């Protein structure tokens, strides 16, 4: 089972407080491991604040200042000092890795310089850090009923308010979060 372009949705039984009520978009999954971005936990800095700290040379005028007020997300505990941009495939950015026909992920600064300008991707989110698992580690967690999985829906990533993404992902599975138990078991 390849989980690339899927969501991991934390079950209420999740013991790790970092991942409780998390939704993680899986960018890469193979026998060597898994890499994803948590899409529903903001950090205490706006995109503009982060860009100001980086001091990018921005050759284009800012024409969409409202897009710079969006929060930066906490993508996960690995490399949490590094920015990751999940974006629609509008243009080719340096080092972008295509996840699907519609989405790519990059750590390249060239895309950051386009944010707020006419050259920005149609849809994007910025996260600090990523969530990672060694080969077989995620599969073990799945067998322990720690996560639910479903095919990713870009509307959850880009169009659903951040606090509602966990609930929305569960609803796509036909699950009412109020009906989930924090107890786990196997039949």
Curated annotation (Swiss-Prot):
UniProt xrefs under Pfam families: DUF179 (PF02622)
Domain of life: Bacteria
Regions annotated as coiled coil: none
InterPro entries assigned: AlgH-like
Cellular component GO terms, alphabetical: cytosol
Annotated TM spans: none
Gene3D superfamilies listed in its UniProt record: VC0467-like
PANTHER family reported for this sequence: UNCHARACTERIZED PROTEIN YQGE, UPF0301 PROTEIN YQGE
Recorded family membership: Belongs to the UPF0301 (AlgH) family.
NCBIfam families on file: PRK00228.1-1 (NF001266)
Name of the featured protein: UPF0301 protein VF_0434
Native organism: Aliivibrio fischeri (strain ATCC 700601 / ES114)
